[in-house]
């Protein structure tokens, strides 16, 4: 074997690995974590912890396919602005490591696959909800709202709320009020979570021409909005306590108090003209949501008596 042949044979695995990692990056695995954090507790609450583990697994697979497909299509649509932002400049399409056509096909295959997987392993409603989520995220949020309004994440964030609806419908075949409350929790949680991160990268959004609220409003205006939505989030988690036991209710109160304290600290710091660390609220908002939904899962598995007596 010549030196050139040996070099090519050794380089092939490296190229394959690079390609696989590039396609994986298109799916935004960290974003998919929200699916795992919220969908499983929703399914457990739907049947008070007695859900078939295989149904949970199949729903998660279908949900991950849907999220991966939506995220990939989002990368295709946002390739031009990703190149202008430091935070996203290393994404595969921004670096041209994956052809746009291939990424589009990849995203469509994942999206179609999610529908048929959920339809075949759960029910038609969960499959249709997955398709609706993908369509909303790509067409309404990415193509319509993101570049046109500072309230983009408020309405566009509805797509991130759908895993609880998909999970609930996979178990029950219907949509009931606890699923709508969980939807509302994530809906209200999304703006403070996203805007806290956007405060850190507001110059990126300005450079890309994306009117994210921190890029077009004062810090005081942004933190006031963050505070309002944080209060709405916490109050909505308390409403869900009607369908749960004392464990979830206790954690919702304690975690909610902690989340509110952090939001007030950010707002008051900006109000006093002090240096603030919005990224801290962003990171802790992840922990808050994880703790609340983990408590919901444990409460459901233990089948603790609910405040409504059912």
UniProtKB/Swiss-Prot annotation:
* Keyword Membrane carried by entry: yes
Q: Which reaction does it catalyse?
A: heme b + (2E,6E)-farnesyl diphosphate + H2O = Fe(II)-heme o + diphosphate
Q: Which Gene3D superfamilies match?
A: UbiA prenyltransferase
Q: How does it sit in the membrane?
A: Multi-pass membrane protein
What keyword terms does UniProt attach to this protein?
Answer: Cell membrane, Heme biosynthesis, Membrane, Transferase, Transmembrane, Transmembrane helix
E.C. numbers: 2.5.1.141
Q: Name one GO biological process term.
A: heme O biosynthetic process
One Pfam family assigned to this protein is: UbiA
- Where, if anywhere, are coiled coils annotated? none
**MF terms in GO:** protoheme IX farnesyltransferase activity
As for subcellular location, the record says: Cell membrane
Q: According to its UniProt record, in which pathway does this protein act?
A: Porphyrin-containing compound metabolism; heme O biosynthesis; heme O from protoheme: step 1/1
Q: Which GO cellular component terms are attached?
A: plasma membrane
Q: Which domain of life is it from?
A: Bacteria
Query: What InterPro entries does the record tag this protein with?
Result: Protohaem_IX_farnesylTrfase, UbiA_prenyltransferase, UbiA_sf
Q: What transmembrane ranges does the database entry give?
A: 31-51, 53-73, 102-122, 124-144, 149-169, 170-190, 242-262, 289-309
Report the family membership.
Belongs to the UbiA prenyltransferase family. Protoheme IX farnesyltransferase subfamily.
The free-text function statement in the UniProt record for this protein reads: Converts heme B (protoheme IX) to heme O by substitution of the vinyl group on carbon 2 of heme B porphyrin ring with a hydroxyethyl farnesyl side group.
Q: Which HAMAP family match?
A: CyoE_CtaB
**Additional free-text comment from the UniProt record:** Carbon 2 of the heme B porphyrin ring is defined according to the Fischer nomenclature.
List the protein's name.
Protoheme IX farnesyltransferase
* Protein species of origin: Mycobacterium sp. (strain KMS)
């Amino acid at each position: 074997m010549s030196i050139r042949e040996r070099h090519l044979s050794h380089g092939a695995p490296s190229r394959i690995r690079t390609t696989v990692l590039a396609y994986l990056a298109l799916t935004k695995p960290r974003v998919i974590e929200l699916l795992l954090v919220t969908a499983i507790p929703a399914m457990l609450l739907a049947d008070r912890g007695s859900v078939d583990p295989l149904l949970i697994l199949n729903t998660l697979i279908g949900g991950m396919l849907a999220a991966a497909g939506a995220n990939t299509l989002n990368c295709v649509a946002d390739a031009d602005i990703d190149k202008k932002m430091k935070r996203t400049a290393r994404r595969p399409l921004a670096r041209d490591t994956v052809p746009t056509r291939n990424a589009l096909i990849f995203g469509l295959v994942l999206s179609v696959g999610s529908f048929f997987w959920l339809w075949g392993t759960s029910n038609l409603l969960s499959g249709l909800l997955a398709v609706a989520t993908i369509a909303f995220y790509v067409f309404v949020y990415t193509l319509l709202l993101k570049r046109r309004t500072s309230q983009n994440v408020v309405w566009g964030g509805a797509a991130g709320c759908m895993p609880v609806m998909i999970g609930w419908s996979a178990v029950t075949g219907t949509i009931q009020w606890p699923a709508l409350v969980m939807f509302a929790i994530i809906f209200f949680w999304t703006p403070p979570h996203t805007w806290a991160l956007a405060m850190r990268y507001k110059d990126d959004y300005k450079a890309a021409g994306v009117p994210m609220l921190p890029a077009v409003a004062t810090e005081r205006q942004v933190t006031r909005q963050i505070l309002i939505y944080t209060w709405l989030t916490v109050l909505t988690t308390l409403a869900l306590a009607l369908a749960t036991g004392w464990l979830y209710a206790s954690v919702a109160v304690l975690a909610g108090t902690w989340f509110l304290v952090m939001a007030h600290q950010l707002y008051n710091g900006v109000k006093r003209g002090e240096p603030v660390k919005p990224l801290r609220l962003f990171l802790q908002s992840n922990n808050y949501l994880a703790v609340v939904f983990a408590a919901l899962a444990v409460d459901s598995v233990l089948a603790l008596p609910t405040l409504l007596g059912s």
